[in-house]
From Swiss-Prot:
Organism field: Sulfurisphaera tokodaii (strain DSM 16993 / JCM 10545 / NBRC 100140 / 7)
Role played: Sliding clamp subunit that acts as a moving platform for DNA processing. Responsible for tethering the catalytic subunit of DNA polymerase and other proteins to DNA during high-speed replication. The trimeric complex inhibits DNA ligase and both 3'-5' and 5'-3' activity of Hel308 (Hjm) helicase, but stimulates Hjc, the Holliday junction cleavage enzyme.
Coiled coil: none
Upper lineage: Archaea, Thermoproteota, Thermoprotei, Sulfolobales, Sulfolobaceae
Protein name from the UniProt record: DNA polymerase sliding clamp 1
Family to which the UniProt record says this protein belongs: Belongs to the PCNA family.
Gene Ontology biological process terms from the UniProt entry: leading strand elongation; regulation of DNA replication
Binding partners and assembly: The subunits circularize to form a toroid; DNA passes through its center. Replication factor C (RFC) is required to load the toroid on the DNA. Forms a dimeric complex with PCNA3 and a trimeric complex with PCNA2 and PCNA3; does not form homotrimers.
Gene3D superfamilies noted in UniProt: 3.70.10.10
Keywords: DNA replication, DNA-binding
Amino acid sequence: MHIVYDDVRDLKAIIQALLKLVDEALFDIKPEGIQLVAIDKAHISLIKIELPKEMFKEYDVPEEFKFGFNTQYMSKLLKAAKRKEEIIIDADSPEVVKLTLSGALNRVFNVNNIEVLPPEVPEVNLEFDIKATINASGLKNAIGEIAEVADTLLISGNEEKVVVKGEGENKVEVEFSKDTGSLADIEFNKESSSAYDVEYLNDIISLTKLSDYVKVAFADQKPMQLEFNMEGGGKVTYLLAPKLS
């Protein structure tokens, strides 16, 4: 197996999000691409990563290879990764995966391939009443500001805008609309609102580095779905259960 990806920062952003979700994770590396699914211990949130082979600079995977790893160790390993450095993934045996960070200096790490059981994911057929394409940096800032004042993020939407807010001793309210350029597109079925644990959203905020816009979907008292579409066809989907009063 030999894989080359030309910007390690994307993987770094994904691992940062996984670190807050699970202690261990499993990359399912197949000839057609890489997948990963993880569910937090409380079964409140789920992350699904899909990286097709076309998005890699080099991709030679003759047969399926499962790579289990400790998220904290992987995060430390990638901490020093620089802009536009390549990451090279090699494996000559199922026991050890060699990761090379290639830039001004080549740093090589031999990572033990640990046994990680894939999570059992129930079949869900979610229907959303609001589907909005929102500026990623704007959403990042809004979540961060709400996390400073409240433990719950309230989101609502109509045919023209999406509003997120948090209330504690202070109040933060952020509006995304086409007039301000923060809302690229919206699909509207009916006015909807729901509440979510802002800490869970703040934990995966690194994913906003993957794309300029985030697809946000929700409905009354239903899970929220965030979809990050990467260059080359990669996609990271995050589902968060609602906070029920």
